[in-house]
Amino acid sequence: MGFFDFFSPDKKNSAANIAKDRLQIIVRERRCCDRDPLYLSDMKRDILAVICKYVQLDPNALHVQFEQKEDDVSVLELNVILPEVSSTGDCSKP
């Protein structure tokens, strides 16, 4: 590093480039999080209705998560907390 290099602006680490990089990260994160399909809430309601035909279930026991892994790969993850089965093995509604 020469003497005059100290006074010249560093193009890689200028404040504008740092701000630009940070803004790109924020935009990328928001795009990733906002990719839930519009039909996801309807799908969750329908899945809950089907499950409730067979077991009594609290609506808060169903968790639905949608992830966009790559441009062409989407993952829909369902977590259902089912009630405990009685000792008789009867799974019907009480």
UniProtKB/Swiss-Prot annotation:
It comes from the Bacteria. The keyword Manganese does not apply. Pfam families: MinE. GO terms for biological process: cell division; regulation of division septum assembly. InterPro entries: MinE, MinE_sf. Keywords: Cell cycle, Cell division. Prevents the cell division inhibition by proteins MinC and MinD at internal division sites while permitting inhibition at polar sites. This ensures cell division at the proper site by restricting the formation of a division septum at the midpoint of the long axis of the cell. Belongs to the MinE family. This is Cell division topological specificity factor. It comes from Hamiltonella defensa subsp. Acyrthosiphon pisum (strain 5AT). The gene is minE.
